[in-house]
């Protein structure tokens, strides 16, 4: 489980291959543990749960600002999503969710300085953070056109600098600025260490698994879940495109889905979808009650099974 590595980094610093995990979450764990004199594990849980609570409040306000989104429905859809139990675990999902939601909310309010600062923290937490620049940059262009507003433009350029800062550290520490990519194969799941695999190849691989592995095998079940989540996410974005949602929302959420697939696998995509915040706003705009009934029934069932397996120590994403 990733949480073990975050706790190890917080306590001992990076060891071989752990560069795959971005640094801000373990740094905050270490800081909280020292000032509060608590264990690293407890500090991590406090950070995750507090971040998610605050992030959820901001998410609700963001939904209220968004045309066509239904705020309460969006919150419920997020809470019952099959992998949402990770928000309470020692993973970066909660911290990233908080930062990314504030970035999008601040962008909608045209508070670009705040968006830039939180975007910097987001890209120091997860690779997806750099794609927030698309949302903020798109809104900047809608407000200012191509005119230069120095303070706001420079603020938005902070967003990718979180990733840049980590890459500079990696170059200094291990001589490889993209060690977070090259270390991926060490953690299994069939990821490549830098070779790009096109999505059609990945889908073909999953098709072969589902047609050659016996259906009662755990491998088949995991592959089916990962593929279904990916296709569901892409379908929601297609519906959003047809409905005329902001192109920046669609691009960002699409990047969250597609970029992991470029490593040759859809492993963890169901969990990464929690980072695709606009996806849940789009979901909340659907009008079919039958769809929401089926969504809730399936999501809650998978949530219960996934959480039970996770609590027993199984890797479920």
Which residues does each predicted region cover?
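Short hydrophobic/aromatic helix or loop-helix immediately within or flanking a transmembrane segment
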Residues: 1-38, 201-202
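Loop-to-helix entry region of an early transmembrane alpha helix in multi-pass inner-membrane enzymes
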Residues: 23, 27, 35-57, 86, ...
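Transmembrane-helix motifs of polytopic, lipid-linked glycan transferases
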Residues: 30-31, 46-66, 231-239
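Transmembrane-helix signature of polytopic, membrane-embedded enzymes
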Residues: 39-43, 59-80, 114, 244-251
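Specific aromatic-rich, kink-prone transmembrane helix
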Residues: 58, 77-80, 95-114, 133, ...
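Membrane-interface transmembrane helices that cradle and orient dolichyl/undecaprenyl
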Residues: 69, 103-114, 141-144, 287
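Short acidic/glycine- and proline-prone juxtamembrane loop motifs at membrane-interface regions
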Residues: 89-95, 269
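Membrane-lumen/periplasm interface segments of specific transmembrane helices
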Residues: 133-142, 146-239, 245-253, 306
